[in-house]
UniProtKB/Swiss-Prot annotation:
NCBIfam families: flgE_epsilon (TIGR02489), FlgEFG_subfam (TIGR03506)
Domain of life according to the entry: Bacteria
Major localization listed first in the record, in broad terms: other
Lineage start: Bacteria, Pseudomonadati, Campylobacterota, Epsilonproteobacteria, Campylobacterales
PANTHER family the record matches: FLAGELLAR BASAL-BODY ROD PROTEIN FLGG (PTHR30435:SF19), FLAGELLAR PROTEIN (PTHR30435)
Similarity remark: Belongs to the flagella basal body rod proteins family.
One Pfam family this sequence matches: LlgE_F_G_D1
Keywords: Bacterial flagellum
Coiled coil stretches, renumbered: none
Protein name per the record: Flagellar hook protein FlgE
Source organism (scientific name): Helicobacter mustelae
UniProt KW GTP-binding keyword: no
Amino acid sequence: MLRSLWSGVSGMQAHQVALDVESNNIANVNTTGFKYSRASFVDMISQTKLIATSPHKGGLGGQNDVSVGLGVNVNSTTKVFSQGSTQNTDVKTDLAIEGDGFFIISPDRGKTQNFTRDGEFLFDANGNLVTNGGYVVQGWMKDDLRNAEKISEDDFFRVDTTKPIQNIQIDPAMMMPARASSNISLRANLNAGRHVDQVANVFGLGSTTKTPVDGINPIYDSHDNLTQKAEDFGALFTQSGDAIGLTENQGIWVSYKTSEMVNDIEATSGESSIEINHTRISFTNDSAASGISSVVAAQNAINALKQKTGVEAFVDNGMLRLQNKNNMDGDAEVKNIRITADGTGAFANFIEGDSDITAFRYRYTTSASPDSGTGQFRTTEDLRALIQYDANLIKDPSQAYTDSTASVSVKFNKYGMLEIQNKDNGDELKQDLNIFVSGYSSENSTNNFSEQDG
């Protein structure tokens, strides 16, 4: 037969062996502890048709021989013991070796020993750690508890690797049958971070105080399920898991209506001044010379300082109407309308003490007895009760407040949200509320709290 055919056949046969090896590797891709193999090729002997010649004396140079190879053969298959990937199996007896090494297993109490990378073990009825094929895993065992008094504490807790290896066995009598837990002792560090991955809604709170004494004691249903409980605002988190982190005197402003005040403006050519929310406003205007009326001049002067007072002025039927929507972040200087000094000139009709208070500041405190009269709160119940009381006060100042019959109810619903309901109390007068919540901030405080925080 032609040599080329022999070489081709040998190549096909050798690559068939290599393909068989790779097929076996693929077939065992999910075999625990399997290490892949590779085929090593070697060329077969060559047939020499012409031998090499040396240079001739007559001047002819030397020539190489003419050799023809006779094909290829598989010399060996080699195991490649590279580190494989590990994965969690949730089986307590499954083990894996990272790096070099083997598990030692034996079918006959150690007379013969085999080695494997397969760590898929389990316990048999006698407590032996065995492979799926029944081979017992061997290694070093810690000293028996009965020997504890004979050796030092350090030696008892040390595994002596100089001793002969033995079967790994755990006495089945050491195992306890499953039973319900009666007491649990826990020692752990609480998460001191400002973010948690899992959050739950705060407990719901009705629109009436839960107890006539303190409004704090929790309420349970007939099945002993906790239904209402006041919670400390300083330990709460937002829906996204970020800590609110309230500290002393941090809090919010809640406006229930737009503050308004209407008054006449006196015509004058001299200087006019007024103090609103402790900000002095003044102007001088001669209507005959400027062509601007005193009421328009007063409007312009007040609007020029709106960023400091929160108050905006309008002219209605020749009268000056002041308005504060209470929607600016800040302290009392930009909330409500308060005349803090007598007006002069065009503002002569504005008297110190005149005010329209429709926004209230609520401040967090760590005190166990918050002063509700100054807007202090500590728990969700404290804040709920404050908002409900003030909302009813703004809606109808003449009505005696009783939380059980309040026409504005405030509660925390089952979703942990503050729910405010303006109920119809039968009064023909339209009593709408325009609620706006803004953050409290002050240049004199480092504990400012913005609406984005909560």
